[in-house]
Amino acid sequence: MHIVADENIPLLDEFFAAFGSIRRLPGRGISAADVRDADLLLVRSVTQVNRALLEGSRVRFVGTCTIGTDHLDLDYFAEAGIAWSSAPGCNARGVVDYVLGSVLTLAEREGVDPAARVYGVVGAGQVGGRLVHLLRGLGWQVRVCDPPRQAAEGGDFVSLERIIEECDVISLHTPLDASTRHLFDATRLAALQPGAWLINASRGAVVDNAALRTLLPQRPDLKVVLDVWEGEPQADVELAALCQLATPHIAGYSLDGKLRGTAQIYQACCRVLGLPEQVSLDELLPAPWLSEMSIDSSADPAWVLASLCRAVYDPRRDDADFRRSLVGDADARRAAFDRLRKHYPMRREIDGLRVRIQGDAPQLAALVRALGAATT
């Protein structure tokens, strides 16, 4: 078999070399000519996989190492009999770490207690649902908006209008489709509560970037964190300058999440081809640089929360790197956006951390477990 794959997918040889030859290409540049003789196509979100790319090719399986599928033409896949798989939940923990790290950074800058805010999570799928679980585990107030889940399950969901009216912090985790494009348009952005924080780590076009750029100079009370941008890899330089944190679509870029994504499409490919799985992620995932921390039972819980989160991930570094890249002409900035993603430094997830508490401190132990770390 012949495999065409995005060059930035990790562990391609380890998982797929036994299937056949692998041709690695830049994801944004994969063309119809490249895939004409391919049997398997492995991509990330930067590759639009549709009729124009695949018609006339031999491709019988498409795997994307991402949660989202808005870059895949699933209707065409069904018509053409092409099997496919995404990697649901692969980077959910990494995105949650990003959101929590961003909240703690804003709280420190603004001099507020993050536990005193009311959180609104828009979209409660793999990522948003995990974020809701963590925030509630910390004992923080959370409202959740997810119309599809509300229609299917009923339960404790609220409208988007209530999120905007009642929440100080709004974190967006919706897929991108016709119903969510510019979900936060000029009207909804203007309706945000005084001093609200808006975090978008889903898809850039869920927020109207032009409307947000126009609004922020008039509403300096609003604090915005953007990891995703309309028109990627071209980010809006003026908008980035108005954000408290700005990063190049790396919220879910933990090493664990990347490798998990490759493993999930490998498993799906084995199922489609009727082949046994011969490789396990557990045997390929390296030990983390930091695996254990020790704290005293007298430690302040707020300090413990910030220290554990930042020991694993601190978004301020990515923000600084991204801002330094926003120079030169448009071509240079686009290249820098992709370069930051391609050469992203190793980052692990907080649930791989073990925390040793010296003494009896049930409150601290509960906090550590709510974060997803283990106590010893």
UniProtKB/Swiss-Prot annotation:
UniProt-annotated binding residues for substrate? S45, T66, Y253
Pathway, per record:
Cofactor biosynthesis; pyridoxine 5'-phosphate biosynthesis; pyridoxine 5'-phosphate from D-erythrose 4-phosphate: step 2/5
Q: Entry's PROSITE patterns?
A: D_2_HYDROXYACID_DH_2, D_2_HYDROXYACID_DH_3
Q: GO annotations under biological process?
A: 'de novo' pyridoxal 5'-phosphate biosynthetic process; pyridoxine biosynthetic process
Annotated NAD(+) binding lies at: Q126, V127, D146, T174, A201, S202, R203, D227, G252
**Pfam families, alphabetized:** 2-Hacid_dh (PF00389), 2-Hacid_dh_C (PF02826), DUF3410 (PF11890)
**InterPro entries assigned:** D-isomer_2_OHA_DH_cat_dom, D-isomer_DH_CS, D-isomer_DH_NAD-bd, Erythronate-4-P_DHase, Erythronate-4-P_DHase_dimer, NAD(P)-bd_dom_sf, PdxB_dimer_sf
Q: Which domain of life is it from?
A: Bacteria
**Enzyme Commission number:** 1.1.1.290
Question: What does the UniProt entry say about where the protein is found?
Answer: Cytoplasm
For this UniProt entry, the molecular function terms from Gene Ontology, in alphabetical order, are: 4-phosphoerythronate dehydrogenase activity; NAD binding; protein dimerization activity
Gene3D superfamilies for the chain: 3.30.1370.170, NAD(P)-binding Rossmann-like Domain
Q: Which PANTHER family match?
A: FORMATE DEHYDROGENASE 1
What this chain does, per the entry, is described as: Catalyzes the oxidation of erythronate-4-phosphate to 3-hydroxy-2-oxo-4-phosphonooxybutanoate.
What family classification does the UniProt entry report for this protein?
A: Belongs to the D-isomer specific 2-hydroxyacid dehydrogenase family. PdxB subfamily.
What is the name attached to this protein's record?
Answer: Erythronate-4-phosphate dehydrogenase
Per UniProt, what is the name of the gene that codes for the protein in this document?
Answer: pdxB
